[in-house]
Amino acid sequence: MDPYKVIIRPVITDKAISLIEKENKLTFIVDRRATKQDIKRAIEEIFNVKVEKVNTLITPKGEKKAYVKLKPEYSASEIAARLGLF
């Protein structure tokens, strides 16, 4: 699956910003057909970082949300700044 089709958009909520600052996690809405491996590969390729783990859930709206924890040597705050979240 094309990495740019896997990631639909970042999530910008108070909880998502808190996760960026406290747990080094980014939150994205992703394609519903994407697997955790697809999401990990897409994030690593697009943002040039290493991913520690990916947690996913389906929202009541029917969207798939992914919580992506980066390895400690990478900063979620820097990625968020590049995305224009800060």
Swiss-Prot record:
Keyword presence, Acyltransferase: no
SUPFAM superfamilies per the UniProt record, alphabetical: Ribosomal proteins S24e, L23 and L15e (SSF54189)
InterPro entries for this protein: Nucleotide-bd_a/b_plait_sf, Ribosomal_uL23, Ribosomal_uL23-like, Ribosomal_uL23/eL15/eS24_sf, Ribosomal_uL23_CS
Alphabetic keyword roster: Ribonucleoprotein, Ribosomal protein, RNA-binding, rRNA-binding
GO cellular component, one term: ribosome
PROSITE patterns in the record: RIBOSOMAL_L23 (PS00050)
MF annotations from Gene Ontology: rRNA binding; structural constituent of ribosome
GO biological process, one term: translation
Superkingdom of this protein's organism: Archaea
HAMAP family found in the cross-reference section: Ribosomal_uL23_A, Ribosomal_uL23_B
PANTHER family: 60S RIBOSOMAL PROTEIN L23A
Free-text function comment from the UniProt entry: Binds to 23S rRNA. One of the proteins that surrounds the polypeptide exit tunnel on the outside of the ribosome.
Quaternary structure annotation from Swiss-Prot or TrEMBL: Part of the 50S ribosomal subunit. Contacts protein L29.
Protein family membership: Belongs to the universal ribosomal protein uL23 family.
Protein name in the entry: Large ribosomal subunit protein uL23
Organism (species): Pyrococcus abyssi (strain GE5 / Orsay)
Gene of this entry: rpl23
